[in-house]
Amino acid sequence: MKIRPLHDRVIVKRKEIEAKSAGGIVLTGSAAGKSTRGEVLAVGRGRILENGEVKALDVKVGDIVIFNDGYGVKVEKIDNDEVLIMSESDILAIVEK
């Protein structure tokens, strides 16, 4: 199945990150909490401004992004990956390499 986001929506695949406690113990499962990083899989055309113009999004396919846990709408697994649909404004930062 292929999903194409509309307007300023972005499709993000959660990326698992290794969580460690303050003492250096690797946390797993619910102790680690939900990842707030993900890879952008698809982007919409852009945000429609009040004057009708379309403002292109700052994020692009392949970007690794940071977002608040709880943002976005969880979609059934696509190609065995849990994906989220969210507005670009829900994304806090792009991780630069």
Swiss-Prot record:
Domain of life of the organism encoding this protein: Bacteria
Entry keyword Cytoplasm: yes
Localization terms from the record: Cytoplasm
GO terms (BP aspect): chaperone cofactor-dependent protein refolding
InterPro entries according to UniProt: Chaperonin_GroES (IPR020818), Chaperonin_GroES_sf (IPR037124), Chaprnonin_Cpn10_CS (IPR018369), GroES-like_sf (IPR011032)
Classification via SUPFAM superfamilies: GroES-like
Chief location bin: cytoplasm
Alphabetized PROSITE patterns for the sequence: CHAPERONINS_CPN10
A Pfam family that the UniProt record links to this protein: Cpn10
GO cellular component: cytoplasm
GO MF: ATP binding; metal ion binding; protein folding chaperone; protein-folding chaperone binding; unfolded protein binding
CDD domains named in the record: cpn10
Coiled-coil segments on the chain, per record: none
Keyword line: Chaperone, Cytoplasm
Entry keyword annotation includes Cytoplasm: yes
Subunit structure: Heptamer of 7 subunits arranged in a ring. Interacts with the chaperonin GroEL.
PANTHER family in alphabetical order: 10 KDA HEAT SHOCK PROTEIN, CO-CHAPERONIN GROES
Family stated for the protein in its record: Belongs to the GroES chaperonin family.
NCBIfam families linked: PRK00364.1-1, PRK00364.1-2
Function: Together with the chaperonin GroEL, plays an essential role in assisting protein folding. The GroEL-GroES system forms a nano-cage that allows encapsulation of the non-native substrate proteins and provides a physical environment optimized to promote and accelerate protein folding. GroES binds to the apical surface of the GroEL ring, thereby capping the opening of the GroEL channel.
UniProt-recorded name of the protein: Co-chaperonin GroES
